[in-house]
Structures are given as structure tokens and as C-alpha cells.
């Protein structure tokens, strides 16, 4: 039985690359769609935010000479491409999905509002909220925090390539140990890179817990939803 009624699932753009160096891996996309469909069939209402790092990153663009605002807008468009791809994969898997955009771009997606997102979820659709916050200088992590708070999600599920939060980067430090749960205060005190500071503080102030888990292992999303203790829970 599902532990959560409504969730905000945050996926990184890089995760959609799968084994590729760039762009979207169709196999990975189909795997994600199948996992999302599985929890949707348990009656969970799902809002999704995807990054755009597999296509373009505004901050790295600024380092290469792009105007930061233009670069961030390019990054927003990258998230829309990823959102359309996931929406298409979900529909192909037999699930109703709708793309909402933080910037007006009909007919590519409908303009986002809290009320539209909640109405769609309550009608059994999966809602993919794209284009970040619609403003430059905000990451998609901040966008996902904002949307999670707005849609009154019970939890933010942050699907990553690692199986939780560690004392240090486990890919670089073999002595790093994993937290099973940790408070927001401890995350901030230790300077752990769960999300950027703005996103973390928003979740803390609005009491939105986060579960950081490995989305690339098939079946993990369902385990999180049913309350199995995988990943790391961040809470007040």
C-alpha cells in the first residue's frame, strides 16, 4: 500500500542520458516511464520536474560566454524537451500525462498554475511541470521545491544516480558513509550538496521532506512509495 498520496518526483536531466554522453536514452526513458506507471497504478498522484543538464546548463553556458539570462532560458527550454520526451514515453506506456510550462508556449504545453496541476492529478493524469520557475538564476532543484510546496505534495522524491546522501561523494571518497535519515539543519551545517541552498531552505521552511534515492535501479521508486527504507530521508 502506498505511504504517500501525492508526490513530487524530481529527475535530473543527466539521468535521461543513460549510457550516452548527451541527449536522451530511449531505453532509460522507457524504464522510468514503467516505474512511474507502477506507482500511478497504486493511486499515487504524481507531479514531475525534470532538469535539462543532458541538453544544456545555463550556468555552464554563462562560463562559456553566454549571457546568464539567455543561458538560463536555454536551460528552461531543455527541460521542456525532456518533459515532452517523458510525457510521450508515459502515454506510450498507457498513462495519461500532461506537460505544463512555467513560461507560456502553447501548444507545446499548457501554462502552469497550481490549480491546473492539482486538477489534472486528481483526474488521474501525471503532471510534468517544465521550464523551472520561469525565471533565470533559479535551478530546477529550486523549481522542484517550489512546485512540490505549491501542489501540496507529501514528499519530494529526488531520483539520482546514487542511493542516498553520504558524508562525502562516494564516487571520490571510499570512506564515505551513508545517512539513512538526516535533518535539514544537519544538511545545512555539514554543507552537504543535496540540492542548492535556496531549494534546501525552501523545503525546510515549508516542511516538505525529501527522499534521495537511486532511480536507476528498477523497482526502487515503488519501494520508496510503499515505505521501504531505501535512500535517505531529509526532514525537520
UniProtKB/Swiss-Prot annotation:
Pathway assigned in UniProt: Pyrimidine metabolism; CTP biosynthesis via de novo pathway; UDP from UMP (UMPK route): step 1/1
Record-listed UMP binding positions: 52, 72, 133-140
Localization in the cell: Cytoplasm
Activity regulation (UniProt): Inhibited by UTP.
Record GO cellular component, one term: cytoplasm
Residues annotated to bind ATP: 10-13, 53, 57, 160, 166, 169
Molecular-function GO terms, alphabetical: ATP binding; UMP kinase activity
Cross-referenced InterPro entries: AceGlu_kinase-like_sf, Asp/Glu/Uridylate_kinase, Uridylate_kinase, Uridylate_kinase_bac
EC number: 2.7.4.22
Organism domain of life: Bacteria
Biological process, per Gene Ontology: 'de novo' CTP biosynthetic process; UDP biosynthetic process
Record Pfam families: AA_kinase (PF00696)
Reaction equation(s) it catalyzes: UMP + ATP = UDP + ADP
Keywords carried by this UniProt record: ATP-binding, Cytoplasm, Kinase, Nucleotide-binding, Pyrimidine biosynthesis, Transferase
Family: Belongs to the UMP kinase family.
Function recorded in the entry: Catalyzes the reversible phosphorylation of UMP to UDP.
PANTHER family: URIDYLATE KINASE, URIDYLATE KINASE PUMPKIN, CHLOROPLASTIC
Record text on subunit structure and interactions: Homohexamer.
Record's protein name: Uridylate kinase
Species the sequence originates in: Bacteroides fragilis (strain ATCC 25285 / DSM 2151 / CCUG 4856 / JCM 11019 / LMG 10263 / NCTC 9343 / Onslow / VPI 2553 / EN-2)
Organism phylogeny: Bacteria, Pseudomonadati, Bacteroidota, Bacteroidia, Bacteroidales
Amino acid at each position: 500500500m502506498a505511504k504517500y498520496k501525492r508526490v513530487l518526483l524530481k529527475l535530473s536531466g543527466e539521468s535521461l542520458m543513460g549510457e550516452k554522453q548527451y541527449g536522451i536514452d530511449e531505453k532509460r526513458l522507457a524504464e522510468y516511464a514503467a516505474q512511474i506507471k507502477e506507482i500511478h497504478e497504486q493511486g499515487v498522484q504524481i507531479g514531475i520536474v525534470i532538469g535539462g543538464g543532458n541538453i544544456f546548463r545555463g550556468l555552464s553556458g554563462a562560463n562559456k560566454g553566454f549571457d546568464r539570462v539567455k543561458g538560463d532560458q536555454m536551460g528552461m527550454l531543455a527541460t521542456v524537451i525532456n518533459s515532452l520526451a517523458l510525457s510521450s514515453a508515459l502515454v506510450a506506456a498507457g498513462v495519461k500525462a500532461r506537460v505544463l510550462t512555467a513560461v507560456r508556449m502553447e501548444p507545446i504545453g499548457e501554462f502552469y498554475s497550481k490549480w491546473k496541476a492539482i486538477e489534472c492529478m486528481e483526474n488521474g493524469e501525471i503532471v510534468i511541470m517544465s521550464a523551472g520557475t520561469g525565471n533565470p538564476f533559479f535551478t530546477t532543484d529550486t523549481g522542484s521545491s517550489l512546485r512540490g510546496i505549491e501542489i501540496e505534495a507529501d514528499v519530494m522524491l529526488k531520483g539520482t544516480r546514487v542511493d542516498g546522501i553520504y558524508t562525502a561523494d562516494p564516487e571520490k571518497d571510499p570512506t564515505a558513509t551513508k545517512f539513512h535519515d538526516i535533518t535539514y539543519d544537519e544538511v545545512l551545517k555539514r554543507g552537504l550538496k543535496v540540492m542548492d541552498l535556496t531549494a534546501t531552505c525552501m523545503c525546510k521552511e515549508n516542511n516538505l521532506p525529501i527522499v534521495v534515492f537511486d532511480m536507476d535501479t528498477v523497482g526502487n521508486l515503488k519501494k520508496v512509495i510503499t515505505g521501504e527504507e531505501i535512500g535517505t530521508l531529509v526532514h525537520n
